[in-house]
Amino acid sequence: MIQISDKAQTYFRKLIEREGVPGMGVRLSAVDAGTPRADAKLEFAEPADLSGDEWAIDCDGFTLYVVAASVPWMDGAEIDYVTQSTGNQQLTIKAPKIKGEAPAESASMVERVRWVVENEINPQLASHGGRVAVQEVSAEGVVLLRFGGGCHGCGMADVTLKQGIEKTLMGRLPGVIAVRDATDHATGDAPYIPRDSAA
């Protein structure tokens, strides 16, 4: 179920009236759903823009159309038009399921490791243009990772592995006993910090 506040409905209605297009509504979709990059997208939608499989939510003076593939990701979403402490007004969308949900404790260790890597570790590494991919998780709980981007060949990869990634995975996932690097760092062509510079 999606909640859209009266203030948000008034805001949309005024914008739609200004456009003056009969039957115009607002279309809501999830972009990159289930990933750390997930976001909600709102756009005007004329009747000809609709595919016909959208979920229609009748609002005061217009219809909110939710793209069918986005419905599960938008469950529990709240759309509001709020006044910030600075006095500015802003449209807000809170969609708690849009980035996906962490796997249950009963999920495999591989699924849980991948979730933490994609949702906690890689967003931090992205600030340096880096990333890691899970290559393997052994039955004993040893995680084998492969660095990429700015982390591939980086002189600080060992520190990142031990003080950042291993600490995070072992702290979040009981059962992970070690994290190892499977990357051939000599082949990195654009490291964040070249290996010969890190001392």
UniProtKB/Swiss-Prot annotation:
The gene is nfuA. Binds 1 [4Fe-4S] cluster per subunit. The cluster is presumably bound at the interface of two monomers. InterPro entries: Fe/S_biogenesis_protein_NfuA, FSCA_dom_sf, HesB-like_dom_sf, NIF_FeS_clus_asmbl_NifU_C. Homodimer. It comes from Xanthomonas campestris pv. campestris (strain ATCC 33913 / DSM 3586 / NCPPB 528 / LMG 568 / P 25). It comes from the Bacteria. PANTHER family: FE_S BIOGENESIS PROTEIN NFUA, IRON-SULFUR CLUSTER SCAFFOLD PROTEIN NFU-RELATED. One of its GO terms (molecular function) is iron ion binding. Keywords: 4Fe-4S, Iron, Iron-sulfur, Metal-binding. Pfam families: NifU. Its cofactor is [4Fe-4S] cluster. [4Fe-4S] cluster binds at residues 151, 154. Involved in iron-sulfur cluster biogenesis. Binds a 4Fe-4S cluster, can transfer this cluster to apoproteins, and thereby intervenes in the maturation of Fe/S proteins. Could also act as a scaffold/chaperone for damaged Fe/S proteins. The lineage of its organism: Bacteria, Pseudomonadati, Pseudomonadota, Gammaproteobacteria, Lysobacterales. Belongs to the NfuA family. The keyword 4Fe-4S applies. One of its GO terms (biological process) is protein maturation. SUPFAM superfamilies: Fe-S cluster assembly (FSCA) domain-like, HesB-like domain. This is Fe/S biogenesis protein NfuA.
